[in-house]
Amino acid sequence: MNIIGLTHKESGCGYHRVILPLAFMDNIKGYVTNFITEDKTDDWDILVYNRICQYDINWNKTKELLGCKVVMDIDDHWDLPYNHINYQSYQDMGKRIETNISEADLVTVTNQALLNKVKQFTDKAVIMPNALPYGINQFTDIKVESDKVRLFWCGSVSHENDIKILREPLKRLTGNIQMVMGGYNDSDPLTKSIWDRMFSMFAGKHPS
């Protein structure tokens, strides 16, 4: 089976929901790109992408060009609260996502709650839980011994409000604790400022 995946290098969702599954799936030919060149339009059985892609303007034309089934993955809810960093952009994107759900030959989701939401638009949906290939490459468990109890959180700047929820409860923790955060990104001033706020809220009085 030949599967082409669409994502871009800065997408964490694309990495975990498109790239990793294709990298570790048995008995397939997988290819991942952010743009399908003319020489890569033939011989595909499945096109898979997360949420949106540049070819979702006209699905009839895209399916005719590639001649394959389309699998859309959606790993989180697209109806965002007003205080979410991506709220404004998703006001326009929501309808696009719902159209993509309806047009897909199959939709994969991460959990039952999301499946229930997606089934409002299609009955061709299944749960594919998040997973990591533990024991391989960067996912090898190399534990550094410590006398501290380490609390680990990993995510992106889109979770700033989630960290705010944790801020006060974390202040009540006592003992020999070390706070560890993963995903830090200082690629631009805005992203860095959000991460610095998140780190301050998460670590609080505890060493990091």
Task: Name every feature range the model reports, one short phrase each.
Residues Y49-L66, I163-I165:
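An aromatic- and histidine-rich active-site surface loop
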Residues Q88-V107:
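Membrane-proximal helix-turn-helix segments that form the acceptor-binding/catalytic region
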Residues E103-T140, R150:
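Donor nucleotide-sugar binding/catalytic pocket of nucleotide-sugar-dependent glycosyltransferases
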Residues K63-P81:
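Active-site proximal beta-strand in glycosyltransferases
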Residues M1-Q54:
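N-terminal pre-catalytic "stem/leader" segment of glycosyltransferase-like enzymes
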Residues C53-Q54, A113-L115, D186-S187:
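Alpha-helix capping/helix-boundary segments
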